[in-house]
Amino acid sequence: MTRWAMVADLERCVGCQTCTAACRHSNATSPAVQWRKVLDIEVGSYPNVSRVFVPVGCQHCADPPCMHVCPTTATRQRADGIVTIDYDICIGCAYCEVACPYQARFLVEKPHFAYGPAMQNEVERADTARVGVAQKCTFCSDRIDFGIENGLTPGLDPRSTPACVNSCIADALHFGDADDPNSNVSRLLREQKSFRMHAELGTDPGFHYIYGKPNDTEEASAAVPSIASVAGEMRTRGVEPALQEHWNWKAASNFICGGVGTGLFVFTAFVGLHYPQVLSLGFVALAIVALGLSILLLKIGRPLRFIYVLRQPQRSWMTREAWIALFYFPLATLALWTGQPVLLIGAALLAIGFLFSQGMILHAAKGIPAWRSAWVVPLIVTTGFAEGGGLFLPAIAPFPALAPLANAVAMIVAVLALLRALSWRVYLTALASEGVPTRTLMVLRPYRSWFLAGGLALPLALIAIGSVVMSTAAPLFAIAGLCIAVAGAVVKFILVTRAAFNQGFALVHTPVRGSGQAGHAVKPGWSKS
């Protein structure tokens, strides 16, 4: 077997960015896109301050999270370990971007050129197939394939070696077959101390960092400690976690509408078994879910390829959500039209499956620590049920004949609001204990009191008063339901668009140049407290 890997010598890298320029020239990327870039990290505190230069890019993981979430199979892995993107079937959903913990993927929504209008050389080399889709480092796979076809050795022969490695003036970048014990990279990894970035996430990256000679006194390598640090410092910009940008309000709308719509349908279906007059609300629920999906369609880079989202149900939760929707809408429509109990229950189960899929979509995004927590799934599910039940209350408020039903539904919604608040509390506690970017907690924590007051305490008080003073029940239940629904929508909006800071970059060890010893670990912008 062959597994191509790259090794960066942190003692040799001088931060000249020649590899970045070579990559840009070789691959004709847009000015703001750097498949290979070099981080400039300050280590220590005055007066003992040093700088470490760290080349980063796609790690070509053995277990790539980007490939697992891709709904279209555009992201694939070759037998030699190189992770590729098929630009012709990528829809530009950016799911792979939020799943990558190395910030190695880019999505260019429209062509950009260095000086505004395109120059002739830019026109000639521009690759329009990359516009609106994901792109990243390819390890210069075309050069590797050329070399193998012509009997050359990638990593040793320049014509079959990645451009960044060829251009490195300090001989800090190396490329070769990590599965070959006699290769150049295998020898380096045996003779030098090394680590891999974010290895604790289980991605098995193919990019190694060496930082000195082995010795008997050094402690064994361990996972990077979550070192508390002040977020937003100038010296850690570009290194600490940054807010993801591609999943914006349009993506948040899908989670909001999906939760409200499926939750409302579940209430409508089960209540409709005994009160058929409420079944018309089910069509409103379907319209809300459809609205969220329609807004999402406007977000993707290549919307005309949306049908490709159905290609990978075996791995991608986004594909599973789409397949569930494909069966959910016709079955739910038929169930509401006929009122058949079996169809109503079946459609309600599909609605629950759709809601669960939305939670799993976030959980599978390994690149966003606030999403990959297992507790995000119960938070999304309970929030969806509470939102749907909350909207159900004002919907039935104008009908006096449904007053006894409203009282029972209000009690159920109150319980769901309590469960949602419990899920929220457990979720925040889990984030603090597991470790997340400092700014994620800075965003989420201020909303705790607001969420509990407006999304739990006030609605429960209104429901309690309405249950005692029956003459005020309908308006109070309606207001309580709206409070619960709005609180859930706000939580999802914040979670998707405001608290979604990426993994950032981290070094298990930093080199002490010339000593062969390891320095301190670096993980700026993170905290466990």
Where are these regions (language model features)?
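Membrane helical hairpin/interfacial module
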Residues: 264-324, 331
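Juxtamembrane/interface segments at transmembrane-helix termini
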Residues: 300-303, 426, 493-506
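Cytosolic juxtamembrane regulatory segments of multi-pass membrane proteins
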Residues: 199-203, 382-387, 446-453, 511-529
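Alpha-helical multi-pass membrane segments and their bilayer interfacial helix-loop junctions
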Residues: 248-252, 293-296, 300-301, 498
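Long, contiguous internal "core" modules enriched in hydrophobic/ aromatic residues
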Residues: 245-249, 253-260, 271-280, 315-316, ...
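Non-ligating segments of multi-cofactor redox enzymes
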Residues: 1-247, 256, 272, 287, ...
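Juxtamembrane interface elements at the cytosolic ends of transmembrane helices
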Residues: 217-235, 240, 302-307, 355-366, ...
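Short, Lys/Arg-enriched, Gly/Pro-containing loop segments at transmembrane-helix junctions
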Residues: 219-223, 433-436, 499-509
